[in-house]
Design a protein with these regions (language model features):
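Short functional micro-motifs and their immediate structural scaffolds
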Residues: 153-158, 172, 176
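A generic structural signal for secondary-structure junctions
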Residues: 44, 100, 172, 182-185
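Short helix-coil boundary/hinge micro-motifs
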Residues: 1-147, 151, 155-156, 190-195
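Alpha-helical elements of the RecA-like P-loop NTPase motor core of helicases
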Residues: 17, 175-178
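Contiguous alpha-helical segments
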Residues: 179-195
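Cysteine-rich micro-motifs
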Residues: 162-172
Length: 195
């Protein structure tokens, strides 16, 4: 069992956070939302890290199956986007459907504030939020979405600078260490062969 603490890569892009609930450890993918207790921990953390309304927070706690299903399409969309490939038709269709299920528009209040109005049930609004977030990321294009190149990571991230190849410093450190280890191992095996 993986020991998980939720690290939010992009608070402003909820789709990245839901997509990154599938992690790679020693070359094996692990679904961090597969068990109900793990999903409930993630849902509680997701509710705290975003601007969910109370009704959406309650909906999140009971939306494991639809979240996991939409996540599958978000991940397919992100893999294609990061690779510069055409977007999968099934993923586009499912995310468009999720977005349409909860129409949203801004309205100006008498207090000079703009309020976002959304219709549809709370689960539909939640799925629409993730779908729209994924659409925005995919529309930004390949240069703005990458898959971490560190060993045993594979998380999606948006680089803060152009040459960035890892989602975080710890991943960069692991990648550099692995590269150094491989180079050192090759050098030492060559010197043993000569003697």
């Amino acid at each position: 069992m993986l020991d998980v603490t939720w690290e939010w890569i992009a608070i402003d892009k909820a789709a990245l956070d839901v997509a990154n609930t599938v992690v790679v450890e020693k070359g094996v993918e692990h679904d961090l939302l597969a068990s109900d207790p793990a999903y409930q921990r993630w849902a509680a953390a997701a509710a705290r890290s975003s601007e969910l309304m109370p009704v959406e927070t309650a909906a999140l706690a009971s939306a494991q199956a639809p979240i996991v299903e939409v996540r599958k399409h978000i991940r397919a969309l992100f893999h294609a986007t990061a690779a510069g490939e055409p977007l999968p038709k099934a993923a586009v269709a499912r995310l468009n459907k999720a977005s349409r299920a909860a129409p949203q528009w801004p309205e100006l209040g008498t207090n000079h504030q703009i309020e976002q109005i959304a219709i549809g049930d709370a689960v539909d609004r939640l799925l629409a939020r993730y779908a729209r977030s994924a659409m925005e990321i995919a529309a930004d294009g390949r240069a703005k979405l990458r898959v971490c190149g560190a060993p045993s990571c594979g998380m999606f991230y948006r680089p803060r600078r152009d040459p960035q190849r890892w989602c975080s410093e710890p991943c960069g450190n692991r990648a550099r260490f692995a590269r150094h280890y491989r180079a050192h191992r090759r050098t030492s095996s060559r010197s043993r062969m000569r003697t």
